[in-house]
Amino acid sequence: MKRTQYNNLVSSYARALFLVSENKLSVVRKEVEFLLAFFKSQHDVFIYLSHPMISFARKKEVIFSVNEHLSESLVKFIAVIFANKRSNLLISVLEKFLTLVRESENELEITIKSAETLSESNIKIITESLSFLGKIVRVDNAVDPSILGGFIVKYGFNLIDASLKSYLDRLVDLSKVEILKTRNFI
């Protein structure tokens, strides 16, 4: 399956779930978050459900065993995905659904990568400076010592790189250009 076909299918299913859930969006959102966490912690279950040789009836049984945490509409939606033999799309569909929910509620999820864990006050300063983007709901502070200092903020497809490593890399590149200029190579 081509990437665009895959993305179109994922988007179509996610929009369908979004439209079906519109009156109870917060409930379905929590269920989807639970389900994604469950599949990430129990990845073998997802692999089992994605296997083409497992019957639709058996897949339905497994999903209904998780039913105490899921609404009937979400279980039926998942059953449709399985019936259409699209179980391999399930995690992507659920993640895309959460993206649609965040967009509809003007929320933003950001990741701040820093050399050390940031204090709450530092996180607050960064999030306040990004307030023009929309309401920031979740901040994930990932630690990556390789950036040496500063931080890198990711939101959506955007990146703000204020890391020391990036700054030093740019200085190295500029110094190479200057050396080449002095030697009349440029």
Swiss-Prot record:
SUPFAM superfamilies: N-terminal domain of the delta subunit of the F1F0-ATP synthase (SSF47928), V-type ATPase subunit E-like (SSF160527). It holds the Pfam family OSCP. Its main location: membrane. It is a peripheral membrane protein. GO terms for cellular component: plasma membrane; proton-transporting ATP synthase complex. Keywords: ATP synthesis, Cell membrane, CF(1), Hydrogen ion transport, Ion transport, Membrane, Transport. GO terms for molecular function: proton-transporting ATP synthase activity, rotational mechanism. It is found in: Cell membrane. PROSITE patterns: ATPASE_DELTA. It comes from the Bacteria. Belongs to the ATPase delta chain family. F-type ATPases have 2 components, F(1) - the catalytic core - and F(0) - the membrane proton channel. F(1) has five subunits: alpha(3), beta(3), gamma(1), delta(1), epsilon(1). F(0) has three main subunits: a(1), b(2) and c(10-14). The alpha and beta chains form an alternating ring which encloses part of the gamma chain. F(1) is attached to F(0) by a central stalk formed by the gamma and epsilon chains, while a peripheral stalk is formed by the delta and b chains. F(1)F(0) ATP synthase produces ATP from ADP in the presence of a proton or sodium gradient. F-type ATPases consist of two structural domains, F(1) containing the extramembraneous catalytic core and F(0) containing the membrane proton channel, linked together by a central stalk and a peripheral stalk. During catalysis, ATP synthesis in the catalytic domain of F(1) is coupled via a rotary mechanism of the central stalk subunits to proton translocation. This protein is part of the stalk that links CF(0) to CF(1). It either transmits conformational changes from CF(0) to CF(1) or is implicated in proton conduction. This is ATP synthase subunit delta.
